[in-house]
Amino acid sequence: MILYASFRTDIPAFYGEWLYNRIKEGWLLQPNPMNANQLQKIESFNIEAIVFCSKDYRPFMKYVKWFNDNYRCIFHYTITPYDSDIEPNVLDKESIIENFKELSNATSKEQIIWRYDPILFTNKYTSEYHKEKLSIMSNELCDYTYTCIFSFVSTIYPWVKKNIPDLIDDYKNKEELLEYINSQNNLHYQTCGHGDEYSSLYPNIGISSCTSVDLLEKVFNIKCIEQKGGYYRKGCGCIQGTNIGQYNSCLHGCKYCYAARNTYKQTLYDPTSPILLGELKEDSKIYPCKAPKVFKKEEQKQLSLFDFI
């Protein structure tokens, strides 16, 4: 199985100790986001690869070597150009860029992916602003990654517009920026969650597929079992896996975030608990995780049971 850590919160930034403890212990419990009393039991020896996603890996660096030695790992690193009006708790961008380089050197250029995600437009954050920042940041990072993934902010959630009152849904801004990205050749640019909406018009922009069979096969020089469906939403080409983490627990406070309207759950955090946030209740029902296998049997890399003794 592929373990995604996580689409719902920032585990490397805030909950890395918990994940390290649980994987070494041999199992963890993941609540159903629609029913917290239903939990999946995820066992470490079933994990074939881990896909991390974070805005700040600095607190996680002490665990990177262990994870990278024992699992096939992909690291998505989100670095965007916004100030405190949009990302109030993600301020030290220069230090984060240096950490991106450190993480790349500790793993490999192939394993780390830069996410310039999401792109939003306001009177302040125009296409010209994004072009300037993309140019600066891509020149900084192109020696440490091959890929930049981007998307445009989703406005289907009403609180996003409420949090960013001057948000502009401007086709001209978007078109100008897409033309600029399409002209760049220092990185491979591809979208997230947009399918081939832009790649059909801009041939140098790749189809949405942040964690694909092609990526895993190229990075780890392996063959994957043929995958049928399992994509997370329309326009998503990611390989099916198990997503851990819980909503309303990320402390970055980003105004565009769909996963954290508040942070009250963070107070329930216990790094020694089998559940990221909260406690196991007497009436909880635990089911085995049924995520599909990804790698062909002879090519799987995973811990043996003896590693947990």
Regions found by a protein language model. Name each.
Residues 1-76, 80-86, 100-104, 263-309:
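Conserved Radical SAM active-site core
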Residues 1-4, 43, 204-247, 285-297:
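N-terminal [4Fe-4S]-dependent radical SAM core
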Residues 8-10, 55-57, 78-82, 117-121, ...:
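Active-site beta-loop-alpha junctions enriched in small/polar residues
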Residues 242-262:
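Local cysteine-cluster metal-coordination motifs and their immediate loop/turn environment
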